[in-house]
A protein has these predicted regions:
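Membrane-embedded alpha-helical bundles that constitute the cytochrome b-like, heme-associated redox core
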Residues: 1-133
Length: 133
């Protein structure tokens, strides 16, 4: 006689995870966040040191400082690493806490678009100062 009670399935974590998609993009995202975090340590130290060193300086001195190739390159790297790290972090927050797909997609597009816009403006400013206006 057949039993009408459903059998318990003994499925471990690996079995439950199968079929949920690839974790490759998650791993790349995780690595990108770690790499930008490590890159930001010396860049942030350089930036803070520079700001402290330039405290009280007039606009001409700051302009002269940023027009030097080393300063312009380091500032550009700092901007790119900071805003890329920010975009990665915001993406995780939105994906984890916004549950409606339409709102999630809209939020990601708006926030990432704003981040790209601000980063591009900052890079344009550095470039404009570095090559002269």
């Amino acid at each position: 006689m057949a039993s009408h009670h459903p059998q318990k399935r003994l499925v471990g974590p690996l079995g439950r995870a199968r079929g949920l998609g690839s974790a490759k993009s998650g791993l790349q995202h995780w690595w990108a966040q770690r790499v930008t975090a490590v890159a930001l340590v010396p860049l942030t130290l350089w930036f803070v040191f520079s700001v402290v060193h330039l405290t009280g300086a007039d606009q001409a001195r700051v302009h002269d400082w940023l027009s030097r190739p080393a300063s312009a390159i380091l500032m550009s790297l700092f901007i790119v690493a900071t805003f890329y790290h920010l975009a990665l972090g915001v993406q995780v927050v939105v994906e984890d806490y916004v549950h409606r797909e339409g709102v999630k997609l809209t939020s990601l597009l708006l926030v990432k678009g704003l981040i790209v816009l601000i980063a591009a403006a900052a890079l344009f400013t550095v470039l404009r100062v570095a090559v002269g206006s």
